[in-house]
């Protein structure tokens, strides 16, 4: 049975919502959850319900706060929940780590404890964005604001494997985020990256403009973390704005097609746009499965993040990335 170390103390709604998500995941997904954090607080929230033995507690008395410097904090707080949870993966006690706490602390813990996969210079945050045709894997979504062409090439290989193995997309289309479709468009980074991506074994389809991302122009969209994070936050803001506009128009639309149908349509759209539906974002490139959650995650988002972790382990993504990057070593900057 797959075991997942879950940082019970990380996030705006910890530990209550984290534990609720763990309980739901244990029952629905059939995974063993190791809740890592303050034992007394966790036991109080569990109230004796350990999902038929599928939930265990690993005591970790310290917590890394959102305002703390990530690297300094994990060095000083060896008994923090995120450090202990990541160490469980390193020791083989757990198969994956999931946290809604400090993203910086999770990245630092994953890098220092799990290490990088050979051939990966910089791990990348991969996230899913809804499109007209399904979803697109966007990476990097914020881990690396300054990149070189070889970094984007590594992101592309890892993103392609994630889309193929975890999302089940055969020969996923990989696009390079740019300001134009032509090969010569963009800055020095994108122009050089384009040339490098053409030489890889992935299904590279060329440049994709911002508007094409949400129209299903590619299955994977590659960019540096600065651009990726702007895209991610813009998409979140736009989704909230559109939902607000829909609600403003409900009164008028009720007279046309009826309240029940409207609410069904609105609910379906909201689910497609809700980050909680997609769970968490795997940190690709570290030597283990590490899934990053939104800081405001509640139970549903945590459950879905645990599902992402389970599927990533089951599909052997980390070994696949190792093998692929070993084969593509000849493509250098």
Swiss-Prot record:
Compartments in which it is found: Cytoplasm
Gene Ontology BP term (one): phospholipid biosynthetic process
Superkingdom in the source lineage: Bacteria
Keywords assigned by UniProt, alphabetized: Cytoplasm, Lipid biosynthesis, Lipid metabolism, Phospholipid biosynthesis, Phospholipid metabolism, Transferase
SUPFAM superfamilies: Isocitrate/Isopropylmalate dehydrogenase-like (SSF53659)
Catalysis performed (reactions): a fatty acyl-[ACP] + phosphate = an acyl phosphate + holo-[ACP]
Protein EC: 2.3.1.274
GO cellular component: cytoplasm
Enzyme class: transferase
GO MF terms held by the record: phosphate:acyl-[acyl carrier protein] acyltransferase activity
Broad class of where this protein is predominantly found: cytoplasm
Pathway assigned in UniProt: Lipid metabolism; phospholipid metabolism
InterPro entries: FA_synthesis, Phospholipid_synth_PlsX-like
Pfam family for this entry, one: FA_synthesis
Family named by the database record: Belongs to the PlsX family.
Job of this protein: Catalyzes the reversible formation of acyl-phosphate (acyl-PO(4)) from acyl-[acyl-carrier-protein] (acyl-ACP). This enzyme utilizes acyl-ACP as fatty acyl donor, but not acyl-CoA.
Quaternary structure, from the entry: Homodimer. Probably interacts with PlsY.
Protein name as catalogued: Phosphate acyltransferase
